[in-house]
Amino acid sequence: MVYVNAKNYFCDSIINNTDRVLSALIKYHGLSIIAVFLLAIGLFHVALKVVSYVAVLLDVFVLPPTNYLPYGSQRGAWAVVTGASDGIGKEYARQLGLRGFNVFLISRTESKLRELAQEIAEKSKVETKFLAIDVSTDSPQNYKDIETVLETIPSVSILINNVGLSHSIPTPFLETPPAELHNIIAINNLATLKITQLIAPKIVESVKEARATKKFQKGLILTMGSFGGLLPTPLLATYSGSKAFLQHWSNALAVELAPEHVDVELVVSYLVTSAMSKVRKTSALIPNPKQFVTATLSSVGRAGGAQEKFATSTPYWSHALLHWWIAQTVGVFSKLVAGFNYKMHVDIRKRALKKQARQAAGGVADPKNTTAAREGYATESLKNETLKH
């Protein structure tokens, strides 16, 4: 609230000072009303850009980390994490455990979930539960199993919608296998919506009970977005559309649940290192899962680079600056950006096809192009080398 008030005060000061300057120009320099009006528009536009950029810097580099006590940290509340067995999802689970939340892990591979649950319980001294399901099947039994576990959990305050799947390689929409289309939508959209529809009522109920006893104050739903949803991404059209859908759905849900004291945010990410991506080396633009999740959980409630959107955050510093620059210059829906994305993914596709051909000639199967890899329950962080968006 203090941050919002300071930002509003800064805007008001610019407007008031601009008004005085323009009045002086008319009175002492004889500028016409039209000239002054056009100048005012230009100054106001520049002022908004300055305020927006300052807000990014404050969000990313200056403001203190988010306080999780209002969300039930160290007060018996549970966090649910989907896609929790690897990458970003695994790191969300670890860091929420360290913040004092009991953790319910949902993913596909039971052995990985069991190992992670044991690790979190030992290191963070919290309770853990896990459930192995394959959401690509969209089986009603999956959701019955989730409900069964939820019945054993007294209080849920956080949901991390991290599960996600993309194309095996950049592919024209007309050449995309129907099974791949189905799996992307089933995992990214249907599973996310159905799991949220199961868990959000539990969060609302838990928050009401906690507020009555002054145990904690609010709930939180974070959904993983992507630059692929922020920017139209040719050759990854279905994935791009699925993430764009999550943007609007999450924003609408944020308005619906605000009266229930549940914060809802979409988290926008660029590429993050992972085992499947084979991008093992971090850089200024490519963090590892720990770096990305630390930035995300430290800045809940702040827009970062997503200053043009509400209930949306681009938290990692380099992603934030890139997002802000694109949005404030050419625009996320510009033909220039779409054309650049298209050329980039055409090149990535060519290299991926050449690699597949070399492996086929050598009798080596590409593990990222197997049915399991394409149709598996992958976390958002498990993007292959084609997802440079």
From Swiss-Prot:
Root EC class: oxidoreductase
Membrane-spanning segments: 34-54
Molecular function terms, GO-annotated: ketoreductase activity; very-long-chain 3-oxoacyl-CoA reductase activity
Subcellular location: Endoplasmic reticulum membrane
Enzyme Commission designation: 1.1.1.330
Membrane-topology annotation of the record: Single-pass membrane protein
Binding-site residues, NADP(+): V80, D134, N162, Y239, K243, V272, S274
Pathway membership, UniProt: Lipid metabolism; fatty acid biosynthesis
GO annotations of cellular component type: endoplasmic reticulum; endoplasmic reticulum membrane
Keyword Oxidoreductase set for record: yes
Pfam families given in the database record: adh_short (PF00106)
GO biological process, one term: fatty acid elongation
Keywords recorded for this protein, A-Z: Endoplasmic reticulum, Fatty acid biosynthesis, Fatty acid metabolism, Lipid biosynthesis, Lipid metabolism, Membrane, NADP, Oxidoreductase, Transmembrane, Transmembrane helix
CDD domains listed in its UniProt record: 17beta-HSD1_like_SDR_c (cd05356)
Active site (record annotation): Y239 (proton donor), K243 (lowers pka of active site tyr)
Major location category of this protein: endoplasmic reticulum
Catalytic activities: a very-long-chain (3R)-3-hydroxyacyl-CoA + NADP(+) = a very-long-chain 3-oxoacyl-CoA + NADPH + H(+)
UniProt-annotated stretches for the region Disordered: 359-389
Signal peptide: none
UniProt similarity note: Belongs to the short-chain dehydrogenases/reductases (SDR) family.
Function summary: Component of the microsomal membrane bound fatty acid elongation system, which produces the 26-carbon very long-chain fatty acids (VLCFA) from palmitate. Catalyzes the reduction of the 3-ketoacyl-CoA intermediate that is formed in each cycle of fatty acid elongation. VLCFAs serve as precursors for ceramide and sphingolipids.
Name recorded for this polypeptide: Very-long-chain 3-oxoacyl-CoA reductase
Organism expressing this protein natively: Yarrowia lipolytica (strain CLIB 122 / E 150)
